[in-house]
């Protein structure tokens, strides 16, 4: 009996060791490499930074805002990119960057489109312009109209993320800081600035409601699939927040996910959950292996389900997944939109 117990104990210990060895791998998030990608190059010159990626109701696009203040539309390899919209009073000559006049010197006048989102029913494109505020342009493009540039008498300093409830047409958007603009974005993180706001615009009444104030670097925003809450990226703290817009918790915000990097835009995934673009990892080192996290897919429970990796030279600001399996990647630095195909 003593010998039998010894064998049982040994078998139990061996089983525990095997579980400890293999369970972490089984529980780890799936990962895929996005190093090899197709590029949709922006017009040659000094234009760069296709920060957000959007498609209209007919599946045309992508559309993306760039560093000279315009929103461009991709028309295929033959035609490439063409101007779709820009802010009021846009002067193409003055807004064209040169070696002696970088876009940072002109963007406060020319605008800097960040988040983009179509209302699929109306065809309207909503634009979160860092300097001009929340704008809208109708189907076909042209000059955009500024809808909101201040709320409760306080100017929008750093309009950033936007999403549209495709059922009601309500528009949700963020102002990342009352104290700093986009050109000073590093100060928002460095100082721990907590003056950001999450807002709602009603296109039927033009009313604007502040849903939450005193936020730390609110960035991208996404309406949940069931339309009960918003998922908001908090860049400096490397977190996602959940803000309830329906049900008994309406008006309440709570932590949703801790992230391994600094999040930018948040977009729904066709496989469930949300793709969160990571501008860079926490405590990322410039040397070593040329690979880092580009994005993570977070499930409805806040757990990381999937990781996307790629070279450190790529720092995405948005991940947009299409039904055909293609993933479009925006960047505030690169002169192209990346397209990755799932294997």
Model-identified regions with their sequence ranges:
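Loop/turn-rich, solvent-exposed surfaces of beta-rich toroidal or solenoidal domains
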Residues: 258-309
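A short helix->beta-strand "capping" segment at the edge of beta-propeller domains
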Residues: 25-49, 94-105, 303-305
């Amino acid at each position: 009996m003593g010998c039998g117990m010894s064998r049982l104990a040994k078998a139990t210990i061996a089983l525990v060791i095997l579980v400890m060895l293999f369970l972490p791998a089984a529980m780890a998030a799936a990962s895929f490499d996005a190093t090899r990608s197709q590029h949709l190059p922006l017009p040659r010159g000094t234009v760069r930074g296709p920060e957000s990626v959007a498609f209209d109701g007919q599946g045309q696009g992508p559309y993306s805002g760039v560093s000279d203040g315009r929103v461009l539309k991709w028309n295929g390899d033959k035609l490439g990119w063409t101007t779709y919209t820009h802010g009021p009073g846009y002067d193409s000559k003055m807004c064209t960057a040169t070696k002696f006049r970088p876009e940072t010197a002109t963007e406060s006048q020319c605008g800097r489109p960040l988040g983009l989102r179509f209302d699929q029913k109306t065809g309207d494109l909503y634009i979160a312009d860092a300097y001009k505020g929340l704008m809208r342009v109708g189907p076909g493009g042209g000059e955009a109209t500024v809808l909101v540039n201040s709320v409760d008498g306080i100017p929008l300093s750093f309009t950033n993320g936007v999403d549209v409830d495709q059922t009601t047409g309500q528009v949700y958007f963020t102002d990342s800081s009352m104290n700093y603009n986009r050109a000073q974005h590093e100060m928002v993180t460095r100082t721990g600035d907590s003056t950001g706001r999450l807002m709602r615009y009603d296109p039927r009444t033009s009313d604007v409601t502040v849903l939450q104030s005193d936020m730390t670097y609110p960035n991208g925003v996404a309406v949940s699939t069931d339309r009960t809450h918003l998922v908001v990226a908090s860049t400096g703290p490397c977190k996602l927040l959940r803000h309830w817009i329906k049900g008994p918790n309406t008006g309440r915000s709570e932590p949703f996910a801790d992230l391994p990097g600094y999040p930018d835009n948040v977009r729904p995934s066709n496989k469930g959950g949300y793709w969160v673009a990571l501008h860079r990892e926490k405590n990322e080192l410039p040397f070593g292996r040329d690979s880092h996290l580009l994005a993570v897919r977070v499930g409805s429970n806040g757990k990381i389900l999937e990781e996307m990796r790629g070279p450190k030279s790529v720092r995405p600001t948005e991940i947009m997944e299409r039904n055909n399996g293609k993933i479009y990647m925006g960047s505030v630095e690169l002169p192209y939109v990346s397209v990755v195909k799932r294997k």
